Amino acid sequence: MEEMEEELKCPVCGSFYREPIILPCSHNLCQACARNILVQTPESESPQSHRAAGSGVSDYDYLDLDKMSLYSEADSGYGSYGGFASAPTTPCQKSPNGVRVFPPAMPPPATHLSPALAPVPRNSCITCPQCHRSLILDDRGLRGFPKNRVLEGVIDRYQQSKAAALKCQLCEKAPKEATVMCEQCDVFYCDPCRLRCHPPRGPLAKHRLVPPAQGRVSRRLSPRKVSTCTDHELENHSMYCVQCKMPVCYQCLEEGKHSSHEVKALGAMWKLHKSQLSQALNGLSDRAKEAKEFLVQLRNMVQQIQENSVEFEACLVAQCDALIDALNRRKAQLLARVNKEHEHKLKVVRDQISHCTVKLRQTTGLMEYCLEVIKENDPSGFLQISDALIRRVHLTEDQWGKGTLTPRMTTDFDLSLDNSPLLQSIHQLDFVQVKASSPVPATPILQLEECCTHNNSATLSWKQPPLSTVPADGYILELDDGNGGQFREVYVGKETMCTVDGLHFNSTYNARVKAFNKTGVSPYSKTLVLQTSEVAWFAFDPGSAHSDIILSNDNLTVTCSSYDDRVVLGKTGFSKGIHYWELTVDRYDNHPDPAFGVARMDVMKDVMLGKDDKAWAMYVDNNRSWFMHNNSHTNRTEGGITKGATIGVLLDLNRKNLTFFINDEQQGPIAFDNVEGLFFPAVSLNRNVQVTLHTGLPVPDFYSSRASIA
């Protein structure tokens, strides 16, 4: 019953209703509280005064509207309009519910009479503090409102069940504890109110005062007062007016405004309304049960939210820590590359210092020797050696020619860390708000007519289905490893076309694509099978070649402008399969030593191929050849090259070896074993040599047969 307590309290005083009356809006008020919130309209602001003054529309025109509609709402004399607006010259105050309250015309009489029986000022109205609807009172004042005897009985039973102390019914502010009850007045008094309102003299001297507990018992045992008609106070209700929805007496039916209305027996309507209320309560009870279950669900959600929050925070911290760890690992890798570049630069500079020191010492020795020879006075002896000395001086001078006195390495580090994409990604790092109402994109469609392969590159194109209405934020393209292995992402972005380079030759790849948005990812498209070229077609790469290299014939023919060896690489790199290419010698003067083989992308370009650890090569003159890697010369083999000779290079990455051929004959044994990684075809030569590259060649038959036998 504790939840019912708010229903039993007056909205004005906040205490249990005392002598509650029913307003036309069906809300209840204490009689004393209703008296306190009466609003008196001054004569100067009455509608008649405004009309007499000839003024225009005012705030009190609402009163006219209500008086014109006194009988429009079931003859109740009840109208709806807003609160009054105060005039500058009229003293007033605002109550919390926005009702305008004027000072009473005279102080309330300090008598023993109930406040409801005191005279009501003229032009009074009352505003319901709950729905704020207003009513102009007639001559009966508050006596025109029926008393809610049922509510009184409910309050009595509730207070008895709570065994609460009885309160005085006449205290104007916070009611004090009652000390007596008058059986005749049926009112509980505290001592101050009893002395003020119920003095023991005159007619009141014959009243019997009893303790509050005894009075409560006698009140409960005494029959409840029967509700009387508000229009005929001496008559009890006997019938029920269906049109006005209120009990009426027989005089109302014979003489009053209900004479022409449909009426029914009071007992029958009492039972009918009780039945209707019970049925309505059943529905409300079901709703209350659902509300309790919903509250349990909400309380469980609070606990679940707490647990999910802790779990999500832990997951977020773990993800951020993983990003930090990955960044630290990448930092270590980049620092290792910087250190490697540092060591490489120092090695190159030190090697050049050593080389120049030796050559300078030789040059200085030759100069000193020539000066001493010039000092000799023996003409015949001088002429015997002068020609050779002159040639040596010119040759030495040529050796100090172009490029020799140029540093092979710059002091600057040609490395620039582009961290802007990562910073942008960090700034864009945010939570993805998944909306259940937003579906995932439709499955993309691969456009077969636009998909193709060239050499070891594949171009794929896709589109959204024509009738798709869900936009895609981007696409994810996946390829397997060419051996039927797991798929891996090769492109993520908004474009609908992508070219993938660096695939293996003579390999079969499977490709698929899916779309994504903030809600999730679509299913994969159908898998597309791609076949790369069986053999490689490529040319020399001018972008990575030394500046002294001269290319022609669509970058298939190469020579050099320097007497020193310079390196040029092919455009295509290999990391898998068997590959064969040839080079024909177009020009060969003064017996130089060109070198042929494979190299990494960062091989030294200003020395013979094989001088560093980034190249694997065979260098050859007109009589013999050598294999060279990391400046180590091995396997001298007889047989050289001349103009028109053909050099073949066979890179078998399946067996991880490199073999050379001259004029279709294998030159020496297998040159290098255990070669793996990414390799580019490479050549080093000087100005005395010109060669032409031939690609797209099948593996020699004899090698294929030997490989199949093995």
From Swiss-Prot:
Matches recorded under InterPro entries: B30.2/SPRY (IPR001870), B30.2/SPRY_sf (IPR043136), Bbox_C (IPR003649), ConA-like_dom_sf (IPR013320), COS_domain (IPR017903), E3_ligase_FN3/SPRY (IPR050617), FN3_dom (IPR003961), FN3_sf (IPR036116)
Gene Ontology biological process terms from the UniProt entry: proteasome-mediated ubiquitin-dependent protein catabolic process; protein ubiquitination
Zinc finger (B box-type): 163-212, 224-266
Coiled coil: 273-340
Residues binding Zn(2+) 2: 229, 232, 252, 258
Domain COS: 374-432
Keywords recorded for this protein, A-Z: Cell projection, Coiled coil, Cytoplasm, Cytoplasmic vesicle, Cytoskeleton, Metal-binding, Phosphoprotein, Repeat, Synapse, Transferase, Ubl conjugation, Ubl conjugation pathway, Zinc, Zinc-finger
E.C. no: 2.3.2.27
Main location: cytoplasm
Domain B30.2/SPRY: 533-702
A GO term for molecular function: zinc ion binding
PROSITE patterns per UniProt: B302_SPRY (PS50188), COS (PS51262), FN3 (PS50853), ZF_BBOX (PS50119), ZF_RING_1 (PS00518), ZF_RING_2 (PS50089)
Tissue localization of expression: Brain. Highly expressed in the cerebral cortex (at protein level). Severely decreased in the affected brain areas in Parkinson disease and dementia with Lewy bodies.
GO cellular component: cytoplasm; cytoskeleton; dendrite; synaptic vesicle
Catalytic activity: S-ubiquitinyl-[E2 ubiquitin-conjugating enzyme]-L-cysteine + [acceptor protein]-L-lysine = [E2 ubiquitin-conjugating enzyme]-L-cysteine + N(6)-ubiquitinyl-[acceptor protein]-L-lysine
Subunit structure: Interacts with SNAP25.
UniProt protein name: E3 ubiquitin-protein ligase TRIM9
Organism: Homo sapiens (Human)
